[in-house]
Amino acid sequence: MPTLQSLAVPFGCVQGYAPGGIPAYSNKHESYFSGERSIDGNLFCGFKYQCVEFARRWLFERKSLVLPDVDWAVHIFNLKEVSDARTGKPVRCVAIRNGTAAKPVVDSLLIYPSDDYSPVGHVAAITEVGDKWVRIADQNHRFHKWDANYAAELPLIHEKGVWTILDPLEDEVLKPLGWVTFPDTPDRNPNEPLVLHESLHFKRGELPTLRRLTFTPTSREKDWLDLTNEAEAYFADVCGIDVKNPKLEKASYYQMNRELYLDCAKYGNQLHQMFLEATKFVLGSDELLRLFCIPEEYWPRLRHSWETQPHAITGRFDFAFDEDTQQFKCFEYNADSASTLLECGVIQQKWARSVGLDDGTTYSSGSLVSSRLQLAWEMAEVTGRVHFLIDNDDEEHYTALYVMQHASAAGLETKLCVLFDEFHFDENGVVVDSDGVAVTTVWKTWMWETAIADHQKARVQRGNDWRPTPKDEVRLCDILLGPNWDLRVFEPMWKIIPSNKAILPIIYNKHPDHPALLRASYELTVELQRTGYVRKPIVGRVGRNVTVTEASGDIAAKSDGDFSDRDMVYQELFRLPERDGYYAILGGWVIGDVYCGTGVREDKTIITGLESPFSALRVYQGAQRRPLTHEDLDKAEAAAVGGGLKT
């Protein structure tokens, strides 16, 4: 049976047309945020393809009205006026509560409340009203192809003189707050041209910024980590954090503004799709695949992985941003990595709160990571036990505990396995754990290249005729590269391709004008010599075996490591700006299929590595956003009645 996810219209494709021929576009799923502005002529509609984007386009085309900027969709219910698109003058609008004597009105906006899952609420257009139903058109709520000129027909209940709209959505029934009407404004004549007054034209706001800020906290929470949480407790033990220490010392953190946050999301989502497209391109060509130096015997299994295991959990881009030049660049995609995930999703927010930075004007750049991590597991279509395979490494340990926590929250059974003593072969040669449970799904921190090397080494040591018996020790390759090609692995084997830097010249050649890409080549070209270049191994980690050469030919930096025997690629030099003596790399997280968080690693050298410290990153938002619920409206109405009685 096809799932709702499999039936979803792809991002950016038309789901249907509302009355008047107004298109509604798919946002893919409700947790996806593209970071891309939608501008229709000179009208800023919103972000592709959120619910407000459709509502603003619909109101403009249907009534020649312009919805003002709102923080969240739910805040439309608080509006008292909108703008006449032709004159720019204010036009009255009226909010009517759901569940009152007023019957819903055609061509009004239906507003949904904040809830725990979606504090921003939702907005839809009411396109038709019957006695027992209303029909709505919207985006980012349902994702199917429309059968008619509306997205859904919702029940309208009329009891004891009260009209109530309900929205049965999958396994829950939502009750909208109410609807916003435009009583003084008839529908626009479709034969008349759309006109937008100059005062309503979109104007680009502030430029993107990234600052390193230093301050001395005025207070400090004593117990800022939760030592009852396994991941946080392990992190505290490893990093030597004294959570009882109230000492106030000078501290530093990074702060980006909303424009840079939007650039991270926009470029992160775009680049993720580019890397996926390039991966498909590479896997379809033996000539290109050979550039990745993967032994040919593994190619069929690699292609099988791509064809049968589309789901992924995490990947991290390395980004850089120069505020002076306003350039934003991607260095590479660590598509098979979860390193610094706990720091981004939990630690930086709890540290910020402990030193008083969480004052409502900023929020953590990793605030969505935990919820999206759980969602990624829910969407991965996994059943049974998930074995978490890690090396005997502290960072891998607390990272695995964090990811396990959210896999468990998604309803999965999990088991942490350090090295391979946990496993043995049963009588049939199947790898099972100490409970006798066969390994069918794995999350791992091991590099796929390590598994391939182990597989080749094992063949030499065991011989070609070896068959597993219960007395044999289980190795990494027996799990990841055993006879079961349908073993679910996160990250899947095909992630070798986007993680390999041999993909960088392919990406650049396919998208040479993309503003976030750097020129890359398999050979040192005259152009790269002119700009300066970075030489790095196609397979490597944490900045090892990297050489940075200036345009003058001088070597600016060089790192050692274990990857010097690998093939190399050459990438255009992008000079990291110095901030207070430090150089910062932005780690941009794609979780599931959506960009959702950013972290910072900084160093006093221009090559960041394993020992480069993680620093907190805050996003400046200005005034704090507040949810709006039925309870909030009830309290406001009660207060208004009470105030009236007192007078």
UniProtKB/Swiss-Prot annotation:
The record marks 316 as: Transition state stabilizer. Changing residue 365 to C: In allele TRS-2. Changing residue 615 to I: In allele TRS-2. Its EC number is 6.3.1.9. Changing residue 293 to H: In allele TRS-2 and strain Silvio X10/7. InterPro entries: CHAP_dom (IPR007921), Gsp_Synthetase/Amidase (IPR051705), GSPS_pre-ATP-grasp-like_dom (IPR005494), Papain-like_cys_pep_sf (IPR038765), PreATP-grasp_dom_sf (IPR016185). Changing residue 288 to Q: In allele TRS-2 and strain Silvio X10/7. Changing residue 106 to A: In allele TRS-2. GO terms for molecular function: ATP binding; glutathionylspermidine synthase activity; metal ion binding; trypanothione synthase activity. Optimum pH is 8.1 with spermidine as substrate. Optimum pH is 8.5 with glutathionylspermidine as substrate. Mg(2+) 1 binds at residues 318, 332. Subject to high-substrate inhibition by glutathione. GO terms for biological process: trypanothione biosynthetic process. Changing residue 90 to N: In allele TRS-2. It catalyses: spermidine + glutathione + ATP = glutathionylspermidine + ADP + phosphate + H(+); glutathionylspermidine + glutathione + ATP = trypanothione + ADP + phosphate + H(+). The keyword Phosphoprotein does not apply. Mg(2+) 2 binds at residues 332, 334. ATP binds at residues 316-318, 501, 536, 543, 571, 606-608. Changing residue 562 to N: In allele TRS-2 and strain Silvio X10/7. Bifunctional enzyme which catalyzes the formation of trypanothione (N(1),N(8)-bis(glutathionyl)spermidine) from glutathione and spermidine. Converts spermidine or glutathionylspermidine into trypanothione. Can also convert aminopropylcadaverine into glutothionylaminopropylcadaverine and homotrypanothione. Also has low amidase activity, hydrolyzing trypanothione, homotrypanothione or glutathionylspermidine to form glutathione and the corresponding polyamine. This is Trypanothione synthetase.
